[in-house]
Every structure is written in structure tokens, then in C-alpha cells.
Amino acid sequence: MLLAGCDGGLAPPPPSPLAVIEGTVYYNGPWPHPDSVRELRFVAMRFVPQSTQELLLRFNEIERSDTLRRFVDSDTFRVVIDLEGVAADTFRYSGIAWKFGPNPFDWRPLVVYDRPLILRPGERRPIVLEADFRNPASFPGSP
Amino acid sequence: MRYSSLLLLLIALPLRAQPERATLEGTVRDVYGTPLAGVNVVLVGTLYGAATDAAGRYLIANIPPGTYTVRASAVGYVPAEQTVTLTPGAHRRLDFALVPTVIEAPEVVVTAARRAQPLEQVPISLSVLSLADVTARGLFTLDDALRYIPGVQMTGNQVNIRGSSGFTYNAGSRVLLLIDGFPMLSPDADGVPFELLPIAQIDRIEVLKGPGSALYGSGALGGVIQVVTRDFPEQPETEVRLSGGAYEPVRHEEWRAHWEGARHWRPFGTAIFTHARRLSDRLGGWIHLTYLRDTGHLNFSERTMLQGYTKLRWQPAAGARVVVLSGLTWRRNDSFLYWNGLRDPLNPGSIPTTGARDAVGANDTQSLQWTLLPAFTHAPGHSFFYTIGGRLYVLALRPLDEQGRPKPLSKGTLGFRYGGQLQLDWQPAEGRYLTFGASADAVATRSSFFPSEDGHPFRSQPEVAVFGQWEEALTARWRLTGGLRFDAYQIRADRWITRLSPRTNVLFQARPGLTLHAAFGLGFRVPGVAERYIENQEFFPIVANPDLRPETSTGYEVGLRYRYRAGLLAELNGTLALFWTDYRDLVEPRFQAERLAFQFVNLTRARIRGLETTLDVRLLGGWLEGMLGYTLLDAKDLTGPEPLPLSFRSRHLLKTSLTMMLPSHLALGADLRVASRPERIDTEFARFVPDAEVTVPVRVLDLRLRWQVSSLTLTFLVKNALDYYYVERPALLAPPRHFQLQLQWHL
């Protein structure tokens, strides 16, 4: 009983300093067929992905928004990032991720933010993106 | 005895109490305050006396004045005497409290080693949990019951006997479940179906520790759980058991903020009805009905279950009997798969990369399960009998849509496990016992998780086996057992896997109450249909691996079992075992980067060694009872160049229990289980599930208070009384403190 009474077991981690990425994406041009736009999210990655495979392998190094609305002219997104124990965090690659097929790995970049994002605790970073399905971005490692 | 009581009563019947005569009355109870009926109370050296009624009362009238020695006696109790002086016309009261004698307890008979034999003659480590133990703790499912057995640790819903299983995401079991001797692993994931038991009609749960494949084939790699159901009694019995309780709201505001349900008490309850009776001089049986409703301590962890079981025994002729056990279980439940991190552990998490909009860490299903276990036993002679048995286990599982409606069965799982066996038991001479048999079994499962092959929607895995066992009492002290089993599994149309599993055991009785044993055995497990064929992207990226090889083990054990009695004062039973098991080709899920998914693969070469000791103490005729079980595990993963701790195993495991009888029919008990934090866990899971690597030691204290009077028993339980938050397996918070009240009415 003494052993069991030492502590209360698991508990929420202490409050962490947070940073926020908030933004708006504007869609230009026509939308593809609904079967080709399964899902859209804003993602911020601490690395530069070379392929879809790397997205999964380094899943915990990715911050992501909720699913964005489809077939609209524009939408907003918000990502809250926990910066516990770090003075700043760098996201080398961010933008809108586009799920174009039914398979789990049918993801590709739609539009990429043109510079790394460096965030400090308490910081709020607004960004604006313009996307065009006729001219999507590609993985840096792709031809 | 009844006749003498009646005689005493007749003698004592007064025609009329004369004023110059005295009267003596009183009550006889046991030391716990329970009234004792049928106790003889006599005035020593006279013909005056009486027997107590159902309330323990007695009355002796018309006694001539004088000084008498009054004696109260009953079978099973130490006779008590008091001296009393009766004056003319006196009406005296004299109460007795009888102390139970230490009657030589009936031998605990176990059957996990394929035949009924006294526990003391079983040459391998074995623990037994009785129905009384299960009832006293308000348990309704097998997994909850196993948590109280030394050497057994639950990792989520996987059973670890001495560290055998680890955690393999609920697919496959390295422990075999037997119900009345029939293997009962589920046909979909080869898992242990914990709720598939008539809990109020079990006689005992036996846990055989160590490789048991020589007895039962695949699946018994780490041990065997044998559930033995009760037979019907001579007199009709009816029992109603009502139980209700609630989970306490979690104390962390941050967790409550994410789920409104965590702010309220979350109720659960169970109602059980059983009736058992003899129907004729050749037929009898019982029926068992259960309703269970649990709102769950996590969001999306509700479950509802309806269950009906029956067992019939028919004796068509002398030396022959037919026993049929059958049960139907309907269940609707949410399976909480993994949490949303340590900041939000009460809600299921999600893996957005799977693409499915409902891809959350919970899986809602509705299932119907039917089991049928018929057996025919015939004894043509005094030293020989045989048993022919069959088994059928049907599972129909349907996922639920977002509105809670069942989807078509084609979206779920339909599974069959069926087979039969013949076993011959022959005792050609005193001290020699032979057991032979053959069995054939098959699993056939169609599941949306298993892609069909060549147009055959059902995945099947038939097997046949022959086995034999020879027990020989070499001398009055030495007993030798040898067993051999041959198994053949068809894993593809053109491919069979065969295994030969020997075992040998030696038992030596050093002196009365002390036996030593040594055991050696090989074990194996053929990967189940789920591990080989599962393909899923909805909840977790996982791909099939049809070429999985069987897991194998080689186990050694030496141990002792001792018993000590000191009259009324103390009774002590203890065990000590040293064990060593080498495992090869253990099947573990691993993330395959080239496949972008998890896959079950033969990966681990491991060694688990350690010691286990248990101590059961009964003091002052049962006034105080205690149990202590400690297991030390040295579990190493030998796959790499350097040994690493084997994942999901606790080095130290402690189970303790204490029960104390109190006055006024009360009994107070406590159970404490402690497991050290696993030295290593599988980090693959933590790639996708936040905080999946977070673990703490397990420290759970349960309290119980029982009040029993006549046929009524009321039990109040506090589970996880210290409200300790922990995980038994990654990313799944175990229940917080919860309270339970159980009413048991036995007719």
C-alpha cells in the first residue's frame, strides 16, 4: 500500500509554451473531380520530404491542421505547436497537402510556402497561400 | 447424527415446565458470528439436551437445579464446554462460539495436465483461482480474474504468463484457453475471448505455466488457461447476482476538458441468473443468463453484452455420460484502440495518413458468438475410459456505422473454429497412467481484413494431431511423466507444417508436505490467420505476410511445493520455481519502410528466465488468510548483437491478497498488484501515436467488504482504490478508481 501510494501515476504534462501558425489558402482555377480531391490539410514539417514514404516514416515531425473544406474559393487553417523545452522550432517545408487517391499514401504537395518558418514560444505566424490544382507543387526529390 | 439430535430433542421436550425446575437457552454461532444449525447442546452426564434450530437457538427446559457442564458440539468444530449453576425456577442464558477445526482440506484436483489429479502430483507450476475467489472480487470476465493470479500479467487484452506474450496488438495468443478441456481461441484473431464464460458457473480457473504444447499443441507456447465449469448439484440451486457501480470522474482538469463524460460518474452493471437442478435420475444441468452494461471510463469504450449458457449431463447407461455445454453471446462494444496523447488520453487518437474520415483510434462492432461443446465419455472397465468430444465456435462480427447501425456482414468477419478429439485414459496398474488421443481442428474465417485468394473468401488452417502421455510412479516417492505430441498444420493447399513436441517431468516427494519437481518441454505456435493475412489501411497501415514461420520455445523448470500445518494456528502452502525458456522466431509487428506499413514478421530470438514464489497463509482457522506471489523476470531479446530487454515485460511482478474475518458476518479483504515499469517498449507504435512510449509502474490496490448472512451476500468493492493512473499496454489508460456493489442471493 505504501508503494502504491507514492504517486498518482500518469498525469498531463505540464503546460507548454505554444506557438500558432494561422493562415488562409486561396484556390485559383477549377477544382478537379471530387474523387481526385479526397482531403486537404495544411502541414508544417521539420524536414524537407523527398517522397511520400518519408512522410510516414517521420510522421511525428509533422504538424498538421484539421481537414480543410473543399470546393470553396478560400479557407483558413490553424496549427498550434507545442514548444516545450525549445527556444525555437524550425519548419523547413510547409504548405497544403493534397490527398488525390484512395490509398493511404496518395498524398502530394499542392502549394508550398516559399520559406522556412521559425517559431518561438508565444509567437503567432500568419501566412497566406495561393493554390492552383492545374499547377501543383511536387516533392523536392521528384523530377 | 440427525437421529441422535432428534432423540435428544424428544428427550428434552417438556410436558410442562415445573416451577422448581430451571430452563437453559442460548445461541450457538461460529467465531465469525454466523448462527450454526444442528449443534448438539447437552448437559454432560444427563439425558438433558437439545439441538439448535436454523437461527442457532436452543432451549432446554425442565432441568433439576444443580451445577452442570454444558457441552456444544458439531462436526467440523471444536466442542465447547461451559459450567453453569441453575437454581430452582432459574431461566439462564448461555451462548457458545465454536471454533472450526482444521479439517484436512479436500485435495485440490486439477485437470490442466489432461487428466484429473491432485495438485500435489502435478509436476509443473500451476495456479488455481476458485469460484469463491472470483465471486469475492466481483469479477465478470476472465481477463479481470487473471489479474489476480501470480505470474500472470495482462498487457491490454493479451495474457502474459511469466512474460511469454508481450504485446502484439491483439493478434495471436501465446496462451491457450481451454473450456472444459476444449481449446477456445477466437477464429478471427486467435485471441482469448475473455467474455465467453458463464462466470457464475465456473468451478475454477487453472493456469498452467510454461510450454504446454506437448499436451495441447499450438497456442500453448507460454502456458494454458483451463476453465472448468460446474456440474449440476443434487438439490436444486438458484442464484441471482446483481452488481452495479461507477467509474469515478478523472481528477485532472485538463483531461476532463476534452471529454464531458469524464466529469461524471460512469456507471456499469451486471445481472446474472443461474439455475441448476437434477431433472431425472439420469439427466441434469444448469442455465446461466448474463446481462452486462458498461458505459466505460474512456470516450468510445461502451459495451453491452447478453449471454446465455447451458450445460446438460445425461447418463444413458452405467459408466457412460454425455455432456453438452453451449453458449450464445451477443455483444456490442466500442474498442478503444489508442489514445490521443497524454494531454488527452480519454479520447481516441487518429492517424490522418490512413485517409479514412472515420479513422480514429476506436472501432465499434457488434458480434454474435455461439459455442457448442459436446462430449461423450464411456468407461467399459474399471481402469479404462475414453472421451469423444467436439467443438464449434462461430463468430459473426459486424462493424457499426457512424449512426451505430451494423454494417453488412460482408464488411465484417464470419469465422468458424471446429473440430473433435478422442482421448483414451488407461490405468493398467496402480501408479501407472496412460493417456492417448488424436484431434482434428480447423479454422475458417472470412473477413474484410483478409483479402480473398483464388476466389476463396474463407481463409482456413486445418490441423491434425496425435498425442500420448505416460505417467509412472517409480517408487512411493518418485513419479515420472513423459509426453509426446505430433501436430500437422496446413497453411496452404500445398504446404503443411509439422511439429513434434516432447515433454518430460519428474516429481519427488522428499517428505510429507514437500515435493520437488523438474520439467522440460518444447512449445510451438503456428501464426494465426489474422497474423498471416491481415491487410488493413483503415485503422492502421498493415500488410499480410503468408510466409510466417511457427514460433518455438524450449522450457526448463525446477521447483518445489510445500505445505505446513500447525494445528489450529496456521496453515501454510508455498511454491518456488526457477524457469528458463528460450524462444525462437517470435512473431512481432514491425514497420516495414519499403512496404510503408506494419507487418507481422518472425523477428525475435529471446530468452526468459526467472523465479517465482507463492505463499498462501491461513491463520487461526481461517480468521486471517493471505497470499503473496512474486515473479522475477530476466527477459532478453537476443536478436541483435547485444542482448536487450524484451519489450513489454516487467522485471518484477508482485501479487498480494489479504482477507480478514470480522464480527457480525463481515469479511474485509484487499488485493495489491504491482508490476515494475517495462524496461523497454516497442517504439514503432510511437511513430504514429503520441506519447505511446509513456509507461509507469502498475500499482493497483483493490478493497472489498463482504457481509454474508444466510443465503444473502452483499459485497462492496473499491477497485483501484488509490486512483492510480497507469497503462497496461501503450496508449490505453487503465480504469481509474471505481466502486461496485454486488448482491448475491443463493437459494
Regions found by a protein language model. Name each.
Chain B
Residues 29-34, 39-44, 73-77, 87, ...:
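Short, acidic, small-residue-rich periplasmic hinge/interaction motif at the N-terminus
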Residues 126, 143-186:
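Extracytoplasmic beta-strand/coil segments of soluble accessory domains associated
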Residues 186-188, 201-203, 214-226, 231-308, ...:
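Outer-membrane beta-barrel translocator/receptor signature
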Residues 332, 339-346, 444-446, 490, ...:
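Surface-exposed extracellular loop regions of Gram-negative outer-membrane beta-barrel proteins
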Residues 380-401, 509, 517, 549-603, ...:
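Membrane-embedded beta-barrel scaffold of Gram-negative outer-membrane proteins
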Residues 475-480, 573-582, 601-683, 742-744:
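Gram-negative outer-membrane beta-barrel transporters
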